């Protein structure tokens, strides 16, 4: 009987630690973290920014696109599809601050009741910050985000 108690004594904490590790490694959906509406139809507009440093002049080039359901329904749907499909992996230490001189994307959506979601900041290498927590974005999601930016760039420039 004593051996069973010892086994349970060690098995329960080990199971809890395993559960915590699995929860830590489980990818999180971007739309859930951003507290977006349940449906993309409830999103009124999306603000999409790309900030790129010009190292020679120490300036930044900011391209800001505000996509609305009235003007650009297809583009808005494309970004909403990305927001609902993208996954963030592995919360990382770092205080939720991005220190990188590279290109940064910022996205946030506004629902039809005019409440804005939390912004997500994404670097080109796939690091992302939401609510002060640093995550890693999957490579396929990063490639899709770059494709959306290229699509926006060809339409508006």
Question: Which residues does each PLM region occupy?
Answer:
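Function-determining sites in protein domains
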Residues: 2-157
């Amino acid at each position: 009987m004593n051996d069973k108690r010892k086994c349970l004594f060690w098995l329960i904490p080990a199971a809890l630690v395993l559960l915590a590790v699995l929860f830590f490694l489980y990818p999180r959906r971007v739309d859930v973290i951003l507290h977006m509406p349940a449906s993309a139809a409830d999103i009124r507009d999306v603000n999409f920014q790309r900030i790129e440093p010009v190292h020679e002049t120490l300036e930044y080039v900011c391209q800001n696109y505000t996509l609305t359901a009235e003007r650009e329904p297809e583009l808005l749907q494309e970004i909403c599809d990305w927001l609902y499909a993208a996954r963030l992996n592995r919360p990382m230490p770092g205080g939720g601050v991005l220190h990188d001189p590279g290109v940064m994307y910022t996205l946030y959506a506004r629902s039809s009741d005019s409440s804005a979601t939390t912004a997500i900041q994404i670097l080109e290498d796939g690091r992302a910050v939401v609510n002060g927590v640093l995550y890693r974005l999957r490579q396929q999601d990063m490639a899709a985000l770059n494709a959306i930016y290229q699509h926006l760039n060809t339409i508006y420039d």
